[in-house]
Amino acid sequence: MRTLEDSSGTVLHRLIQEQLRYGNLTETRTLLAIQQQALRGGAGAGGTGSPQASLEIGAPEDSQVLQQATRQEPQGQEHQGGETHLAENRLYRLCPQPSKGEELPTYEEAKAHSQYYAAQQAGSRLHGGDRDPRGASGGSRRQDEALRELRHGHVRSLSERLLQLSLERNGARVPSHMSSSHSFPQLARSQQGPQPRGPPAEGPEPRGPPPQYPHAVMAQETAAVNDPRYRPRSSPHFQHAEVRILQAQVPPVFLQQQQYQYLQQPQEHSPPLHPAALGHGPPSSFSPPALEGPPGAQATSGSAHLAQMESVLRENARLQRDNERLQRELESTSEKASCIEKLENEIQRLSEAHESLMRTSSKREALEKTMRNKMDSEMRRLQDFNRDLRERLESANRHLASKTQEAQAGSQDMVAKLLAQSYEQQQEQEKLEREMALLRGAIEDQRRRAELLEQALGNAQSRAARAEEELRKKQAYVEKVERLQQALGQLQAACEKREQLELRLRTRLEQELKALRAQQRQTGTLTGGGGSHTGSTELSALRLSEQLREKEEQILALEADMTKWEQKYLEERAMRQFAMDAAATAAAQRDTTLIRHSPQPSPSSSFNEGLLAGNHRHQEMESRLKVLHAQILEKDAVIKVLQQRSRKDPGKATQGTLRPAKSVPSIFAAAVGTQGWQGFSTSERQTDAPARQTVDRGPAEEPPATPPLPAHTKHGSRDGSTQTDGPADSTSACLASEPDSLLGCNGSQRTTSLDSIAATRVQDLSDMVEILI
């Protein structure tokens, strides 16, 4: 019973510890009252009292201080993990890890605990009614009932057997250290090692184990190990909804009972869980011990596994702290690097601006220095000249004074002359001053002109750069034109190959037609020779007529395709002519605007002459580019026509339905007669005239037995894009009745009619090939 009391006391101690850490005062008092009742009940049932219970009851404040001191603070993994990690570790934090000296139970013990409490929970659900989980008296009553029921059954014999096995496995081990908390004897007992589990002091009906109970336990254990559907609760994949309900709704006073139900529900409906399901906490915090497994290696492996899990969790927390620290350092270094980069860019910009200012100031200083030197030289020259004038004036005055002294008579004349000379000198001096002012104005004009020349030089350089850029663009256009010319040559070669294939097909069809004519002649001779083979000859004649009809349908389909190509060619030619005219008008307008708005160069300066030559070259380049652009437009139109021809489906030539006959030269004549198409030359009309005459002569040369083939004409619409068929129904009817009428004629008439039809169609095909080329 000491073991049962230790387990229940340990659970209550841990709940009180959690409540003292996170709960309020009323719930803490309720838990302390429950612990006192449990200790009193355990002391009365076992016959022996705990000497430390009074200390524990009398001094709850000291125990609270010691519990808060001995509780290990979280290392940061609760705050560093995500929501999934917090959801996984909430049950683990509610049932804390044992202290360093506490011995962990084995897997067999934990399994026996869970099985026994599952059975007890099922019995309490069947026999008990609805209980209020929030009452303190109800919780203490439930715990007393659980302690009372543990004294019954076959737990006594099993506990004795497990005690013997544990003593044999561990030997006579002396408790080496005591707990640091003297107010809670449960912690001291758990750190001293496993207590000897004797039989309960009192309990009604002590009986032995049921037969074959260990075998059933081993079978359930093997089923739980081999079943892959159940995973440990420590894995991130095993998350049950009841854990969140327990954390959110159930108060921490009775969190222990809800944990019991959470661990018992999977055992009521399914095989036992994996051994790692109880890895996050000691099994004694969930249920009292009932069974222990006989092998000793599993205990060491379980403790090693738990120690490894603890080390992994500590390492994970340390790595997460290091990761956050490194992330903060990385953010700070990145901010510093960005600031340094901004400072470097600003310094570089300032240095460049300073260099440009230094260059401009040096130029300005050099210019000012030259002008100042010129002005100083001019002023020195004028000062020398003024000094000379003064010296001359002084000499004249001295000479005048000497003359007055020598001769008083002629002094007045000399004074007048000297006055006149002085007046002239004054005028000359004023003139020199005016010239100096003019020179100063000229200096200012030269300075302004130099600035204007610098601006013109910058503009000319910018225009030259733009001209070079346009030249590069136009060179790229020229390269594109060359590539398009190459593609055009390739398309022309492909079209020639296709025309050769069509010509071969035409010749093969003509050969087949000749063979059919020979067969018809043979059948005609056979029908004229004897009457015994009339049935077979009629069948062969019908078969030959069907073959001839099929060949005629193929020929008519080819003719229809050729007329369609002719119509597309005419449309593309008209569009190309329109595009070329538009491009020519646009180029002419650009030329006129450029010539009109071109700057008029002044022939007085060499700089303007250079600008004139550059503008002339630029205009020549633009005219050349306009010519190339017109050529590109023309070749683009030709390429579009060839691309439409290449996209033509070749399978349309072998259509099985009978299509109306369309005479190619008649269409061509109608197109020439229409005012919408003005692009044909007189040579094409002359080459087309014999073909129309042969077509017109073809039906006239046939015998009266064969119905004439009416000319099929097309009426062009106003925009030239649509055409309407004339007597298409009559033409199709005539073509449908043509093989029958040919069969009804004799051999010579049939041969002449087929030859004339073949000749006219070959001529039409040759004309169309020439037109397309």
From Swiss-Prot:
The keyword Transferase does not apply. One of its GO terms (cellular component) is podosome. Monoubiquitinated at Lys-342 and Lys-403 by Crumbs complex-bound WWP1. De-ubiquitinated at Lys-342 and Lys-403 by USP9X; the interaction may be promoted by cell contact inhibition. Deubiquitination of AMOTL2 negatively regulates Hippo signaling activation. Residues 101-302 are annotated as: Required for interaction with CDH5. Belongs to the angiomotin family. It comes from Rattus norvegicus (Rat). The modification Phosphoserine is found at S753, S756. It holds the Pfam family Angiomotin_C. Residues 304-577 form a coiled coil. The record marks Y107 as: Required for interaction with MAGI1 and ACTB. GO terms for biological process: actin cytoskeleton organization; angiogenesis; endothelial cell morphogenesis; establishment of cell polarity involved in ameboidal cell migration; hippo signaling; negative regulation of transcription by RNA polymerase II; positive regulation of protein localization; regulation of cell migration. Residues 196-213, 701-710 have a biased composition (Pro residues). Residues 220-302 are annotated as: Required for interaction with CDH1. One of its GO terms (molecular function) is actin filament binding. The modification Phosphotyrosine is found at Y107. Residues 41-157, 169-238, 259-309, 589-611, 677-754 are annotated as: Disordered. A motif (PDZ-binding) lies at residues 770-773. There is a cross-link at K342, K403 (Glycyl lysine isopeptide (Lys-Gly) (interchain with G-Cter in ubiquitin)). It is found in: Recycling endosome; Cytoplasm; Cell projection, Podosome; Cell junction. Residues 80-91, 100-112, 141-152 have a biased composition (Basic and acidic residues). This is Angiomotin-like protein 2. The record marks Y213 as: Required for interaction with YAP1 and ubiquitination at K-342 and K-403. Residues 177-190, 719-734 have a biased composition (Polar residues). Keywords: Cell junction, Cell projection, Coiled coil, Cytoplasm, Endosome, Isopeptide bond, Phosphoprotein, Ubl conjugation, Wnt signaling pathway. Regulates the translocation of phosphorylated SRC to peripheral cell-matrix adhesion sites. Required for proper architecture of actin filaments. Plays a role in coupling actin fibers to cell junctions in endothelial cells and is therefore required for correct endothelial cell morphology via facilitating transcellular transmission of mechanical force resulting in endothelial cell elongation. Required for the anchoring of radial actin fibers to CDH1 junction complexes at the cell membrane which facilitates organization of radial actin fiber structure and cellular response to contractile forces.
